[in-house]
Amino acid sequence: MNLMLALTVNTLLTALLTIIMFWLPQLNSYAEKANPYECGFDPLNPARIPFSMKFFLVAITFLLFDLEIALLLSLPWALQTANLPTMIKTSIMFITILALSLAYEWTQKGLDWTE
C-alpha cells in the first residue's frame, strides 16, 4: 500500500510538472524569445566574416605551450624514478626546447598583438 501511494504521488507530480513545463513558456512569449541565439553572433548575417589570422596563430601558440606545461606538471613525480640521470637529462632537454621555441616565437614577433 505504501509503495502504491508513493508511485501514485510520483506519477501525479511528474505529470503536473510536465504540464506546467509545456504550458508556462506560452504565457511569456515575445519576439526576442523567438529569435535564435548563437553565442552572440547574428544568425542573419553572412557566416563567412573575415577571421584574424594573428588571433589564430596566437591561439595555436597558446595551445602548444599549454600542452608543454601540462607535460611538465608530472615532473615532481618523475623524480622518484630509479633512472634519475636519464630523467633529468630528458627534462632539461624538454625545458630547453620550450625556452628556445619561446625565444623563436618572440623574435619572429609572434607574440605581438599590436600589429
Curated annotation (Swiss-Prot):
One Gene Ontology cellular component: mitochondrial inner membrane
Catalytic activity: a ubiquinone + NADH + 5 H(+)(in) = a ubiquinol + NAD(+) + 4 H(+)(out)
Matching Pfam families: Oxidored_q4
Keyword terms: Electron transport, Membrane, Mitochondrion, Mitochondrion inner membrane, NAD, Respiratory chain, Translocase, Transmembrane, Transmembrane helix, Transport, Ubiquinone
Keyword Hydrolase: no
Family annotation (InterPro entries): NADH_UbQ/plastoQ_OxRdtase_su3, NDAH_ubi_oxred_su3_sf
Principal location listed in the UniProt entry: mitochondrion
An individual GO BP term: mitochondrial electron transport, NADH to ubiquinone
Topology in the lipid bilayer: Multi-pass membrane protein
Alphabetized GO MF terms: NADH dehydrogenase (ubiquinone) activity
Localization of this protein: Mitochondrion inner membrane
Entry keyword S-adenosyl-L-methionine: no
EC class name: translocase
Transmembrane portions of the chain: 3-23, 55-75, 84-104
UniProt EC number: 7.1.1.2
Reported function: Core subunit of the mitochondrial membrane respiratory chain NADH dehydrogenase (Complex I) which catalyzes electron transfer from NADH through the respiratory chain, using ubiquinone as an electron acceptor. Essential for the catalytic activity of complex I.
Family indicated by similarity: Belongs to the complex I subunit 3 family.
Subunit composition and interactions: Core subunit of respiratory chain NADH dehydrogenase (Complex I) which is composed of 45 different subunits. Interacts with TMEM186. Interacts with TMEM242.
Protein name: NADH-ubiquinone oxidoreductase chain 3
Organism: Papio hamadryas (Hamadryas baboon)
